[in-house]
Amino acid sequence: MYLYFETQDRDYKVIIDSGKLQSRIMYALSDSHMHKILQSTSLYDKPAIDIIHEQELPYSTAYKKIAELVKWGLLVTYKSEIIDGKRVAYYKSTFRSIKVNFEGALDTKVEAEPNLDALERLTLRFYDL
């Protein structure tokens, strides 16, 4: 993964050159349920139940897709709290925006604007282990 910065208006962009991550991003964007989940969590952290109601997703499908997006690193558990004795996880997309540039079979470029607060949470959680 290659990272470059444009510091004028703090517009950070990441060029993703890992074939595996590119494939996962393109798959997630082409899957309608994953796409809706990423859209819903690109700006604000939300619990799964809010994502399900807001995007009108089937419960079991939504939970499976959320777990897969977390495993791929495209979604992070932003925070969790206990409500009525149950742990509720809030999710946030790792990226604020994603741009895919497809120029034939040999050149596919994926550029993304990271959600810096989501990545910061992920980093803090990693160092807490």
Predicted segments, located by residue:
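Short acidic, hydrophobic short linear motifs in intrinsically disordered regions
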Residues: 44-54
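Short, cationic-aromatic polyanion-contact patches
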Residues: 22-31, 47, 80-102
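N-terminal leader segment of winged-helix/HTH proteins
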Residues: 1-25, 72, 81-82
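Amphipathic alpha-helical dimerization/coiled-coil segments
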Residues: 96-129
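Short helix-to-turn junction characteristic of helix-turn-helix DNA-binding domains
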Residues: 29, 38-44
